[in-house]
Amino acid sequence: MKSIYSLVLCTALTAASPHPAFPQSPLGVPTTSSPSTGTFNSAEEVINASPFLSFHRDIVQIESISSNEHNVGEFIADFLRARNFTVIEQAVTSSSQRENQERFNVFAYPSSNTPEILITSHIDTVPPFIPYSLDTDSTTDNDPSTIRISGRGSVDAKGSVAAQIFAALDVLEQNPSAPLGLLFVVGEETGGDGMRAFSESSLNPAPSAFHTVIFGEPTELALVSGHKGMLGFEIVAKGHAAHSGYPWLGRSAISAVLPALSRVDQLGNIPADKGGLPSSPKYGNTTVNIGRVDAGVAANVVPATARADVAVRLAAGTPDEARDIVRRAVRDATDGNPDVYAEFNTRSEGYPPQDLDTDVDGFDITTVNYGTDVPNLQIHEREDGPVRRYLYGPGSIHVAHGDNEAITVGDLQEAVRGYRKLIEAALQRR
């Protein structure tokens, strides 16, 4: 392991930014600054007084919609270099990235240590960009912890990114030899190309260098025992175009696809023994969402093609098993019409439900329905036992992709404490 990271260190130093944005400072300096629990003059005063909240503000203010993560990546990399981390900017290629704007993952660890505990989240966001703002209308008794911070990424997942960094700095202040690694990836919102690039690289060796991986996503400060699996596909129908005044001269792809869509839409509510998708006590029902339908060219033309995008959240079973169920459902609903079929090759492979660890006391436990980068990181076996995986973070997924994305100061501060608790538990297992 040490030889791998020595080689990587040389590469990182060669590629280091020529214009660091922060003055050098040792790790052993106070890093978190909690606002006073008393009165305050303005929300801006509270943010400015806290290095942690100021850092969160700074990264939320940088637009980083998927494929445009370069600037926020450089900001985070410079911040960590200034605090004596070895920083590796791992290039991640994308056909949609902006010209001259290289995308990269940020992998960082204290310069004197080989990381054994990996702390990770993502730095990309969904569109559109929403500027950073503060709201004190909901504060109670002039309590700074109730200040609401809004903006794209304030929750998903820059809240986790900021809290993870400052939790790590807190731990390193007390224990400079803690073997921590920080990984902030691109592209989580669009398929996980950043995490897959890391997973397939020498930075993720076999056997695993990491005995613990802590993932950051909005979990409302609960420790997640697992999340549903995922399968994406299209339902495709082929017809024959004709003038709408003479529809018998053509074949309507829309008419052909409707029975298949109706059947697929209900698969999560149909018992598995009757041809539906499986459920489980832990995750409940598998859910199906027909998110987009594209068909026809005009109202006066019999449609020759129809395509529907479908997302399935798997509560049990494997993607291959679900594919077989979908194929049978489409075939049965259309009486075996060969012009209507499920197309799986245009979507990613999918993954089964992901079970996670919850053996650290002091957290509420929950499951979630959304997808994460957890399945995109291949976990290699270790001789000393299984690699533990945790999923935790501040904020709610219910606002994460909406125009009301927001988080409170109190939740951000509690997340630092939560991540520190997870890190300290991992250190005790060394």
From Swiss-Prot:
It comes from the Eukaryota. One of its GO terms (biological process) is proteolysis. The keyword Cell membrane does not apply. Zn(2+) 2 binds at D156. Its main location: secreted. Binds 2 Zn(2+) ions per subunit. The keyword Protease applies. Disulfide bonds: none annotated. Its EC number is 3.4.17.-. It is found in: Secreted. InterPro entries: ArgE/DapE_CS, Bact_exopeptidase_dim_dom, Peptidase_M20, Peptidase_M20_dimer, Peptidase_M20A. The active site is at E188. One of its GO terms (cellular component) is extracellular region. Its cofactor is Zn(2+). Residues 1-16 form the signal peptide. Belongs to the peptidase M20A family. This is Probable carboxypeptidase AFLA_037450. It comes from Aspergillus flavus (strain ATCC 200026 / FGSC A1120 / IAM 13836 / NRRL 3357 / JCM 12722 / SRRC 167).
